[in-house]
Structure formats: structure tokens, C-alpha cells
Amino acid sequence: SEGDPKGIELSHKNLLTNIKQIGELLNFHKDDVILNSLPIFHSFGLTVTTLLPLCEGIKMVSVADPTDGATVGKMCARHRVSILFGTSTFFRLYVRNKKFHPLMLQNVRMVIAGAEKLKADVKEAFKLKFGLEIYEGYGATETAPVASVNMPNLLDPETLQEFTFNQAGSVGMPLPGTIIKIVDL
């Protein structure tokens, strides 16, 4: 938010439920590696890049400074990072960093943006440089923090019908077990 900082009270159950919901969507593989580069003083960083891998038993690689694109790239390459969380701002830095080579992300299978609106030009430039789609999510600290996320579209092999889970300009589908209501105040 842009106002004065406020404390938000979340229970252990809030956090663990959100972690479980995210885990169900990401369908972890036994060899997955998550890059932990988001600050843990922010609910998105604490939940998805710190608590999620710890609770789900996923290997985690930590980088202290997410704005240091060269180090982020090196860590992704060295440790075969497969899941990358970030913000539009950080992804823009990676695109612009000449030391961040596209092959450094060759093991990444999922890139998810949160904490701020994913800018269309960032999404496009990231795909152009790295060949990877960024899936945008939505949440707030009060939602512990993820409420919805775009995911890759799926094709039913029997009917060849495409199921759309990724819509440009949208924040995606609600997490499993989540009901969202939009109201006009």
C-alpha cells in the first residue's frame, strides 16, 4: 500500500493454507529448485520464496539482493533453478542486465510475478530475452498473500480442447478453495 504501514494479523493456519494452495497449483517435481530472492519483510517473499519451499520440502537457493541481476542469473544457472518468483521491477532489471544471459534460466519451468502489477512491456521483453512466459498473480498481505494466479493453458488430449488459465491483463483464477467476489462500491 502507499499509506502508513499497518500490522496485519495472520494465523499460522492462514499462512499454511496459502502455502498448500500454491503447492497444489504448481505441481512440484522432485527436482524443483526455488530461487529465494524476495525480501522476507514482505508477505509475498516470506510466503512463496521462504516458507513454501521449507514446508513443501523443495530445494531453495537464496540470493540476498534481488536487484543484482548478474548474481541472480549465476545462482539460477549453478543450482538449476526451476521456479522463479519476482516482481515486475526485478524482471525488468534482469532483462536490461547484459550479464544476465538467457541460458542462465534454461532450467526454469515457471516464472510468477506478484507484489505489483506486471507491466506488459516487461512481460514481452522477458519472453523475448529468456523465452519464458511470466504468469501474473494477485494478492495482498491480508490474503496471506496469494489470492489468484495465472497458470499455463492446458490441452485435453482426448478432446483437444484448450483450457485457458492464462489471460493477459488478468490476475488469474482464484487459488483452490478460494472464492472471490467483485463488488462495485
Where do the PLM segments sit?
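Conserved helicase ATPase motor motifs in RecA-like P-loop NTPase domains
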Residues: 1-3, 116-117
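Conserved AMP-binding A3 loop
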Residues: 2-17
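Conserved AMP-binding/adenylation subdomain of ANL enzymes
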Residues: 16-33, 41-82, 97, 152
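Gly/Ser/Thr-rich phosphate-binding loop
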Residues: 81-86, 95-166, 179
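Short Gly/Pro-enriched turn/cap motifs at secondary-structure boundaries
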Residues: 165-174
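Conserved beta-loop-beta connector loops within the AMP-binding
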Residues: 174-185
